[in-house]
Amino acid sequence: MTTHYIAGNWQAGQGETLQSLNPVTQAVIWQGQGADASQVDAAVQAARQAFPAWAQLSLEARIDVLEKFAAQLKVHAEAMAQCIGEETGKPLWESATEVTSMINKVAISVQSYRERTGEKSGPLADATAVLRHKPHGVVAVFGPYNFPGHLPNGHIVPALLAGNCVVFKPSELTPKVAELTVNCWIAAGLPAGVLNLVQGARETGVALAANPGIDGLFFTGSSRTGNLLHQQFAGRPDKILALEMGGNNPLVVDEVKDLDAAVYTIIQSAFISAGQRCTCARRLLVPQGAWGDALIARLVEVCKTITVGAFDEQPAPFMGSVISLQAARALLAAQVELAAKGGVKLLEMTQPQADAALLTPGIVDVTAVADRPDEEFFGPLLQVIRYADFDAAIDEANNTQYGLAAGLLSDSRARYQYFWLRSRAGIVNWNKQLTGAASSAPFGGVGASGNHRASAYYAADYCAYPVASLETASLALPATLTPGVTL
């Protein structure tokens, strides 16, 4: 099976056997063999050979290819949404919004490039100061499974726009989405070698990250893998490394007037995408007392009614499946562990079908747990922590190695300003779902959540490096020579 796209040609893999499964039915969606180290190297070399010509194209010529790619996505939007839903388990309504985000990324990236990394100049007394940006060269892009189209697209589009060439390794759990995406690039007329696709799991990823021919690596995924990459690239300032990782995100609730609005926002923050967004709320901080009791009771009541189902089920469910049976089992095990440590299951997360990766929402009160794990439970498992006062809530919110997203539900602007100032996170929302983000704003966090603002407006910053120049059209002696020099 032709599973890799290298130097403009599809070819079969020479590495480990791979399968992509529908997480609900367990039907085989895609199968092939991963790329071995020699194929990874061939992809890097193909990108290296294509780089000079691609980088020397005018910006407008590269934009033309990107816009044709967006047009191809529009043509194939239904098939792409179907594939995303089938491979990830997310409902079709959500898969369709992901394709829309992929399409919109082109215009956003062009605007960002012009504003943040375009050419600027200013006159000096005897020269012109010019700021331009140059591409790094060949960059590797590692994509995640939760948004297999949108998130790698957020690296690839600005990287190509800046003049880089790319070797793309998607998640081994979503190879078909990657294949469809690359086919859209081919149909858009992207020259051979500019974008290369290598499918595979750990073997392929290790070979790509270690290949001396790459000038950088852009990664979106788990903190565990991101930390390994960070260690691998330690002492290599010659390589650009952009990491967008996870979070143990807190959502603090104040005593707001509209209880149901708070409940709805919590659900959208914790359980959308079956809890498989890096910005999902993992910890819900609720005030002690009668108001907090009422909020939790209402939250549990509503969460019991949340519909869970297959990606194409009608009427459409709110939540689809998690990515795999393995992921579902790990989440169920995490719930058991929290209970063993003293957590109280307010709403037990269950697996309605033993052979399907469908999970119902789970809510565990971990207030009494002394050694709460600072982990990202990547699924529909929400931990509740009761707090005595607002300062204690902020302290608990910041009690994490991560720093991706934090949110406050409060009727008080003063409280929000106080919260915003003290929060340690790259995204801080007020009375909006934690998973909400603006495409024109930076996306990313601090601490163990990453180092750059990946896949969004500020992606332009790490896809090219600034070059400062002093320029004048003719060489001439200055009117006054430096002391000690005679001509």
UniProtKB/Swiss-Prot annotation:
**Where is NAD(+) bound in this sequence?**
G221, S222, S223, R224, T225, G226
User: What is its pathway?
Assistant: Amino-acid degradation; L-arginine degradation via AST pathway; L-glutamate and succinate from L-arginine: step 4/5
What is catalyzed by this enzyme?
N-succinyl-L-glutamate 5-semialdehyde + NAD(+) + H2O = N-succinyl-L-glutamate + NADH + 2 H(+)
Q: Name one GO molecular function term.
A: succinylglutamate-semialdehyde dehydrogenase activity
**Which regions span the lipid bilayer?**
none
A biological process term (GO) from this entry = arginine catabolic process to glutamate
| Known EC number | 1.2.1.71
- What is an example of a Pfam family matching this protein? Aldedh
Q: Which family does it belong to?
A: Belongs to the aldehyde dehydrogenase family. AstD subfamily.
HAMAP family attached here?
Aldedh_AstD (MF_01174)
Q: What is this protein called?
A: N-succinylglutamate 5-semialdehyde dehydrogenase
Organism, scientific name: Pseudomonas putida (strain ATCC 47054 / DSM 6125 / CFBP 8728 / NCIMB 11950 / KT2440)
Question: What high-level taxonomic lineage is stated for the organism?
Answer: Bacteria, Pseudomonadati, Pseudomonadota, Gammaproteobacteria, Pseudomonadales
